[in-house]
C-alpha cells in the first residue's frame, strides 16, 4: 500500500499577484480578454509544475477561479441571476465578473451578488441566489477545459469540485421563500454530466468538497447526502472532502455514502485517527489532512508522523494539506528581509508541499531522519526569548472584571456625548478610509524603499489628510475621518507598530476577486512600544471644528486577519492586543479626540463552525473589545464597525460590546440585517450602511432615502446614523464624491421631513 500525497488546492493569484494585475487591467479596459485568459493559463501551468517539482503526486485541477470558486460552480450549473444574464442566454467571463463586481467590460451593470466569508476563513465567496422552479444546466465548462490543459501537460490530475449539498447550503433564496434543498434533484443531473465527462477523460479520482459536513447541520440536510451521492456514484472514484473542523459528529451519515475515500482535516478537527480508521469502511481510502493549509508555521513533522503511523499499511492512505493552500502565501524562499531565525519557523504553500513529500517518504520507508531535521527549528522556537515577554504575561494575568466596564451605562454616556458634539438628526459619516490613490501608494512605497526621507513622507501624508478633510467639509459630512492615507492595510498597519508581529514582502493571500491581503504573523507576546495613530488623528482634528474620528482596528479583527501563533490560545492573543490598544484609546482621548472607532468586522467570522463552541468564543471576544474600549470617558463616543454579518444569532454579544454607535454592512442585504436589531430592541445607536462600496456603481439619492426610511421603520430615527457599508479605500475619488454627495443629500432631505 504505497502512500501518496496531494494538496486540496493551491493559491491562484501568483507570486507577484499576476492574476490581480491582469484582472484589474482587463476591468479597466487596458488589456484584452485573450490577454487575461493567457495569464490564467500561464499561472495554472506554473502552479501545477511547482507542486509537482515539490513532490506532490496528485495535482488539484479546478481550484483556479477567475473570481471565486463558488461563483465558478454557479456558472458551471447555469445559475446566473436574471439581472446578470446576457440577452442571448450565453455565459462568458464578463457574466462572472458582473455577478462578482456589478459590472464588467461588456453587459449591463447591475447589483453585484452578496459576498460573505467562506466558513471561518478570510476568503470570501459570492453567495449563490436561488429562485423557485429554477432550471440548471451545464453552462460553464472551465473545469473540463482546465482538466484537458493539465492532462496535455502530462500531469496526474485530481479534479476538484464543490459538492452539491454544500453548494445549496451556501446559497440564499431570493423572492418567494421555499426550501433551497428542494433544488437538489435539479442540480444533480449537471453533476452527473460533469463526472461523466471527467470519466471520459480517464480521470480516476475526483475531490468533491463537502465542507458543510463539519457543521451541525439540520437533519434534513444530513439526510440529503445519501440520495445525492447515490445519484453520483459509479463514474469515477469520489474523495469526499471536508475541512476546517472534524467529522466525528457526522460520521454515521458519511460512512453510509457510496464514495471511495474521505479527506479529514486533522489540524483543525479533533478527530482521533484510530477511531476514524475503525469506523470507516475498510475499502475506503483515508486522506489525512496533516499539514495546516491555513497558517504559515513550519510543521513539526515528527508529531505528524506519530499521529498517523499506526494505520500505515492497514488501509489505503494519502497525506494532504488540511484544506486548500489558497489560504497560505505561496513561497517563503522569496522572503529576503525576514530574520533567519524567524524565517526558519515558517512554511508557505510550496514549503508545505515539500513537507507533504517528506512525510510521504518517511511513512513509506520508515526512515524519519529527514523529519527530525525539518522539525528542529520549530522545536527550538518554544524556548526563544523572541516569543515570551514576561511584562505582557504579567499584565494579562492581572486583568479584573472592572477593566472591561465603562464608567457609566449608555444612557448616561449618550447624554454627555450629545452635549459635547451637538450633531444633527441623521448624522452622516464614513467608515474610515478614503481612496488609496496612486499618489498615496507611490508615496508610501518610496518611503518604504528608502527613496524618500521621513520629512518629505510626512509632508506628503499630511497633505493627503488635509485634502480628505477639505473634501469631507465640502460634501457636508458631520463626523469626519482622516482618510488613513498612511495605512496600507487596517491590520498590517497596527501589526507594524506593535511588538510581537512580523511581516512578509510577498506573503499575499486572496481575500476576494482581485483583492489580496498580506496578513501579519503573530510570533510572540504583543505590546505597544509607542502611540500609533495619535499624531495623525490630532493633526486632522486641528484642521476642522467638526469631530474627527480616531480609527483603530479591534483586537479580534487583528487576531482573525493575522496568522496567529499556534502555541497559545486565540483568547490570549486577543487580550494581549486589547491591552496594547487600550493604551492607544487613552492617548487619543488625551489628545482631544472625542470619537474613537474600534473596528471589529471580523467578530462574527471568528465564530467556531459548531454552535456548541460559540459561547466560549463570544465571551472572550466581547471581553477583549471591552478591555480595549472601557478606558474611555463618558463623553468619548466609541463606535464600532462590522461587515458581512448576520447578527440575529449573536445579538446578545453585539449588545454586550456596549459600543455607543455600531455601523454595519446592510445595503447588499437590503436592510435585512436590521431585523435582528429591531427584534432584539438594540439599545444603542446604529449606522446601517446605505450603499455597497464593493461595487463602483453610484447609488441615487432616492435609493438611499428609501433605504433609510426602511431602516427608520425598524430603529427609532433619533438613533440612526447615515454611512456607507464599509471603508472607501478601494474606490476611486469620482464615484466616492458622487456617492457621498447623494448620501449627504438624502440625510438632509430626511431632516427637512
Swiss-Prot record:
SUPFAM superfamilies to which the protein is assigned, alphabetical? UROD/MetE-like
Return any one Pfam family short name. Answer: Meth_synt_1
The GO biological-process annotations, alphabetized, read as: methionine biosynthetic process; methylation
Molecular function GO terms recorded: 5-methyltetrahydropteroyltriglutamate-homocysteine S-methyltransferase activity; zinc ion binding
InterPro entries on file: Cbl-indep_Met_Synth_N, Cobalamin-indep_Met_synthase, Met_Synth_C/arc, UROD/MetE-like_sf
Identify the residues that bind 5-methyltetrahydropteroyltri-L-glutamate: 17-20, 117, 515-516, 561, 605
Amino-acid positions noted as binding L-homocysteine in the UniProt annotation, renumbered to this chain: 431-433, 484, 599
Positions that bind Zn(2+) = 641, 643, 665, 726
Protein family (similarity comment): Belongs to the vitamin-B12 independent methionine synthase family.
- Give the protein's function: Catalyzes the transfer of a methyl group from 5-methyltetrahydrofolate to homocysteine resulting in methionine formation.
Q: Which NCBIfam families match?
A: met_syn_B12ind, PRK05222.1
Annotated protein name in UniProt = 5-methyltetrahydropteroyltriglutamate--homocysteine methyltransferase
Q: Which organism is it from?
A: Escherichia coli O139:H28 (strain E24377A / ETEC)
Amino acid at each position: 500500500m504505497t502512500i501518496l500525497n496531494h494538496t486540496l488546492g493551491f493559491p491562484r493569484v501568483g507570486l507577484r499577484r499576476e492574476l490581480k494585475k491582469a484582472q484589474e487591467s482587463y476591468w479597466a479596459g487596458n488589456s484584452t480578454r485573450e490577454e487575461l485568459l493567457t495569464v490564467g493559463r500561464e499561472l495554472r501551468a506554473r502552479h501545477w509544475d511547482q507542486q509537482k517539482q515539490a513532490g506532490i503526486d496528485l495535482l488539484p485541477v479546478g481550484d483556479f477561479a477567475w473570481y471565486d470558486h463558488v461563483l465558478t460552480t454557479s456558472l458551471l450549473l447555469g445559475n446566473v441571476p436574471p439581472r446578470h444574464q446576457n440577452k442571448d442566454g450565453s455565459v462568458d467571463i464578463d457574466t462572472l465578473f458582473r455577478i462578482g463586481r456589478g459590472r464588467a467590460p461588456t453587459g449591463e451593470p447591475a447589483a453585484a451578488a452578496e459576498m460573505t466569508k467562506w466558513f471561518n476563513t478570510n476568503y470570501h465567496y459570492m453567495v449563490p441566489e436561488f429562485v423557485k422552479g429554477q432550471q440548471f444546466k451545464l453552462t460553464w465548462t472551465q473545469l473540463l477545459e482546465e482538466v484537458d490543459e493539465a492532462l496535455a501537460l502530462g500531469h496526474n490530475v485530481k479534479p476538484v469540485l464543490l459538492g452539491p449539498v454544500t453548494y445549496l447550503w451556501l446559497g440564499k433564496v431570493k423572492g418567494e421563500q421555499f426550501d433551497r434543498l428542494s433544488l437538489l434533484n435539479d442540480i444533480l443531473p449537471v453533476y452527473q454530466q460533469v463526472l461523466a465527462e471527467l470519466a471520459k477523460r480517464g480521470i480516476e479520482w475526483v475531490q468533491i468538497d463537502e465542507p458543510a459536513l463539519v457543521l451541525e447541520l439540520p437533519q434534513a440536510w444530513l439526510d440529503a447526502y445519501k440520495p445525492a451521492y447515490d445519484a453520483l456514484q459509479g463514474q469515477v472514484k469520489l474523495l469526499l472532502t471536508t475541512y476546517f473542523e472534524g467529522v466525528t459528529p457526522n460520521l454515521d451519515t458519511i460512512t453510509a455514502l457510496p464514495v471511495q475515500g474521505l479527506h479529514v482535516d486533522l489540524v483543525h478537527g479533533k478527530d482521533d485517527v484510530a477511531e476514524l480508521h475503525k469506523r470507516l469502511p475498510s475499502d475506503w481510502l483515508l486522506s489525512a489532512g496533516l499539514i495546516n493549509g491555513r497558517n504559515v508555521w513550519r510543521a513539526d513533522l515528527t508529531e505528524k508522523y506519530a499521529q498517523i503511523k499506526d494505520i500505515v499499511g492497514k488501509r489505503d492512505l494519502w497525506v494532504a494539506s488540511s484544506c486548500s493552500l489558497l489560504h497560505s502565501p505561496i513561497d517563503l524562499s522569496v522572503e529576503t528581509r525576514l530574520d533567519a531565525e524567524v524565517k526558519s519557523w515558517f512554511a508557505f504553500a510550496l514549503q508545505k508541499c515539500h513537507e507533504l513529500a517528506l512525510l510521504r517518504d518517511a511513512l513509506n520507508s520508515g526512515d524519519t531522519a529527514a523529519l527530525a531535521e525539518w522539525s528542529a527549528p520549530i522545536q527550538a522556537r518554544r524556548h526563544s526569548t523572541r516569543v515570551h515577554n514576561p511584562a505582557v504575561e504579567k499584565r494579562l494575568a492581572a486583568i479584573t472584571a472592572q477593566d472591561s466596564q465603562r464608567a457609566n451605562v449608555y444612557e448616561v454616556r449618550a447624554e454627555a456625548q450629545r452635549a459635547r458634539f451637538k450633531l444633527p438628526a441623521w448624522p452622516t459619516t464614513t467608515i474610515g478610509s478614503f481612496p488609496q490613490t496612486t499618489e498615496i501608494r507611490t508615496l508610501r512605497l518610496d518611503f518604504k524603499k528608502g527613496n524618500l526621507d521621513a520629512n518629505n513622507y510626512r509632508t506628503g501624508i499630511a497633505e493627503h489628510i488635509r485634502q480628505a478633510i477639505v473634501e469631507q467639509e465640502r460634501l457636508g459630512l458631520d463626523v469626519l475621518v482622516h482618510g488613513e492615507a498612511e495605512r496600507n492595510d487596517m491590520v498590517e498597519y497596527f501589526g507594524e507598530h506593535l511588538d510581537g508581529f512580523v511581516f512578509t514582502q510577498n506573503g499575499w493571500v486572496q481575500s476576494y476577486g482581485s483583492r489580496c491581503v498580506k496578513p501579519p504573523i503573530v510570533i510572540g507576546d504583543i505590546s505597544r512600544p509607542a502611540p500609533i495613530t495619535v499624531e495623525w488623528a490630532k493633526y486632522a482634528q486641528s484642521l476642522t471644528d467638526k469631530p474627527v474620528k480616531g480609527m483603530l482596528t479591534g483586537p479580534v479583527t487583528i487576531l482573525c486577519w493575522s496568522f496567529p501563533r499556534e502555541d497559545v490560545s486565540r483568547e490570549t492573543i486577543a487580550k494581549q492586543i486589547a491591552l496594547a490598544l487600550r493604551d492607544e484609546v487613552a492617548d487619543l482621548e488625551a489628545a482631544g479626540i472625542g470619537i474613537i472607532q474600534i473596528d471589529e468586522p471580523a467578530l462574527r467570522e471568528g465564530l467556531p463552525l459548531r454552535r456548541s463552541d460559540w459561547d466560549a468564543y463570544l465571551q472572550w471576544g466581547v471581553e477583549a473589545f471591552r478591555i480595549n474600549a472601557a478606558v474611555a470617558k463618558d463623553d468619548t463616543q466609541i463606535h464600532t464597525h462590522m461587515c458581512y454579518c448576520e447578527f440575529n444569532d449573536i445579538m446578545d454579544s453585539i449588545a454586550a460590546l456596549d459600543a455607543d454607535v455600531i455601523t454595519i454592512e446592510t445595503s447588499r442585504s437590503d436592510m435585512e440585517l436590521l431585523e435582528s436589531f429591531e427584534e432584539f430592541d438594540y439599545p444603542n445607536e446604529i449606522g446601517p450602511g446605505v450603499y455597497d462600496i464593493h461595487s463602483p456603481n453610484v447609488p441615487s439619492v432616492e435609493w438611499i432615502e428609501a433605504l433609510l426610511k426602511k431602516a427608520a421603520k425598524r430603529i427609532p430615527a433619533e438613533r440612526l446614523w447615515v454611512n456607507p457599508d464599509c471603508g472607501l479605500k478601494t474606490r476611486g475619488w469620482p464615484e466616492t464624491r458622487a456617492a457621498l454627495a447623494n448620501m449627504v443629500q438624502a440625510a438632509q432631505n430626511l431632516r427637512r421631513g
